[in-house]
Amino acid sequence: MISRDAAATRQRILEHARRQFARHGYTTVTVKGVADAAGVSPNLITRYFGGKDGLFLAAARVEIPVADSIHGDRAGLGARLAASIVQRWLGAHGEDPLLVLQRASGERPEAAEALAAFLDTNSLEPLHRYLRDSGLADAEARDRAAAIDAFVLGVSTRRRILRAELGDPAALEAWLGATIQRLADGLG
């Protein structure tokens, strides 16, 4: 008798779904395609996730401790954030839930809302608080945080969604770090 592990099966389905949604967006991915890739029946996807929408929402759940990268002296903020960003872009290739949300945000309003909520909670607000706590006035801290957030999202969209190459990771990290630092310092 074959033992069944529902948690492992569910995780395998999610891994394949993330990969497919990240590469192809929401519209072209099918329940059958994910089921075939995961080696399961499409009925299991319906049972575990309720269908394609539920599968998408589960695959796009983002939990990234962005705030961990901002602690420290403001003079090193750009370097810390850039290192974290490039590591994520290189390490989560093809399965990054954030990439799933970015790619699907033009197709699905709930993906756009989930991406906006994630960025507000995990990027914009922590940066705003950090910059304010480092001595900037509240409005200035918010403006600089918004500039950093918009810059990183723009670069991510250009490099990951539009499928341009990331290029040399060290050069990318140095450029991102310098640009983020200029924005944090109000020089951008």
Across the structure, where does each feature detected by a protein language model lie?
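An amphipathic alpha-helix signature
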Residues: 79-83, 120, 124, 128, ...
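Hydrophobic alpha-helical connector segments
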Residues: 66-99
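Alpha-helical DNA-contacting segments of helix-turn-helix folds
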Residues: 56-63, 70
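Hydrophobic/aromatic-rich alpha-helical bundle segments in the mid-to-C-terminal region
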Residues: 112-117, 131-188
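Short alpha-helix boundary/capping elements
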Residues: 53, 89, 106-110, 123, ...
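Amphipathic alpha-helical segments used for helix-helix packing
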Residues: 90-121, 162
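Short alpha-helical scaffolding segments that buttress acidic/His motifs in well-ordered protein cores
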Residues: 85, 98-105, 148-152
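Basic, helix-initiating cap at the start of DNA-binding domains
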Residues: 1-43, 50-54, 65
